[in-house]
Regions:
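Glycine-rich Rossmann NAD(P)(H)-binding loop
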Residues: 151-156, 182-189
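Conserved beta-loop-beta element that borders a ligand/cofactor-binding pocket
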Residues: 90, 95, 116-136
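Glycine/proline-rich active-site loop of Rossmann-fold NAD(P)-dependent oxidoreductases
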Residues: 135-146, 172-182, 188, 205-206
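Non-catalytic, hydrophobic alpha-helical segments
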Residues: 54, 165-169, 184, 192-195, ...
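NAD(P)H-binding glycine-rich loop region in Rossmannoid oxidoreductase-like domains
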Residues: 21-86, 97-103
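N-terminal Rossmann NAD(P)H-binding glycine-rich loop of SDR-like oxidoreductase domains
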Residues: 1-23
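A conserved pocket-lining segment of Rossmann-fold NAD(P)-dependent short-chain dehydrogenase/reductase
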Residues: 125-126, 139-160
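Mobile cap/lid helix-loop segments that border enzyme active or cofactor-binding sites
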Residues: 189, 196-250
Length: 250
């Protein structure tokens, strides 16, 4: 089966592409460096020739609201027009758990535009909403750290390993379109500061975690349960501590 992976040069895209190729599928990488630009439409029609499935793992160059909304609206329009012309039978998009619940956050509002674009397109689709990745922990520490202190929110957190994310993307790709939304999350739920503290403990870094109910996440005030599933979800297999031990040992 021929599958176009938009954002195929990114970390998630590379892993998804490798797994699909290992299963015997023909994967086309959709990125400007491979001659496919979803912002201009360049190379899209050629990439979609005899293609059955599109996986959209694209992201804006900046999380800033205006930039992100412009990206997802423009790219989404180009993708839908090209996919309708090519009779694509399944479009998948990777999104974020909680997108509906905090539209005052500009980036989530942009992701909602991306979701709605494919929902209203007439193309069979599956939206995969994921919690934050285990691999995001270093970014949290970098953004919220100051000298030897890391200020971390006590909001609910249920991160998932990138390995599990890509396994689910491949699984849903090879299933029939849901024409709806599925959610994926890690196997363990706790407060965000618990995960960060455990990671720092395993790493041996001389950092101290400070947290309270008012602490911000990535400089944003977010609802306590925004980043975790509110209903049914597909659980990952890799526990955070096991991932951290493996990652930090390398």
């Amino acid at each position: 089966m021929k599958i176009l992976v938009i954002g195929g040069t990114g970390l998630t895209g590379r892993l998804v592409s490798k797994k699909l190729e290992k299963l015997g599928h023909q994967v086309i990488i959709g990125s400007p460096s491979h001659g496919v630009d979803i912002m201009t439409g360049e190379g899209l029609s050629q990439a979609l020739e005899n293609t059955e499935i599109v996986i959209d793992l694209s992201n804006s160059s900046s999380p800033e609201e205006e930039n992100a909304i412009n990206f997802f609206l423009t790219a989404g329009k180009n993708l839908v027009n090209a996919e309708l012309a090519a009779n694509i039978r399944h479009h998948l998009v990777l999104s974020i758990v909680g997108t509906d619940d905090a539209l005052e956050i500009g980036y989530l509002r942009a992701k909602k535009h991306q979701e709605d674009n494919i929902k209203n397109s007439g193309i069979p689709y599956t939206i995969i909403r994921s919690t934050q990745f285990h691999e995001h922990t270093d970014t949290i520490i970098a953004v919220q750290g100051l000298a030897d202190k890391v200020f971390v929110s006590k909001i609910d957190y249920q991160p998932i390993a990138l390995e599990d994310v890509t396994d689910y993307i491949v699984q849903f790709t090879l299933e029939e379109p849901k024409n709806g939304t599925v959610e994926i999350a890690g196997p363990t739920r706790a407060n965000m500061d618990d995960f960060v503290a455990k990671y720092i403990e395993i790493s041996g870094k001389p950092l101290k975690v400070f947290s309270d109910e008012d602490s911000k996440y990535m400089h944003l005030v977010v609802p306590k349960s925004l980043l975790v599933p509110a209903g049914e979800y597909n659980a990952g297999k890799i526990h955070f501590e096991d991932w951290a031990l493996s990652t930090l040992a390398n």
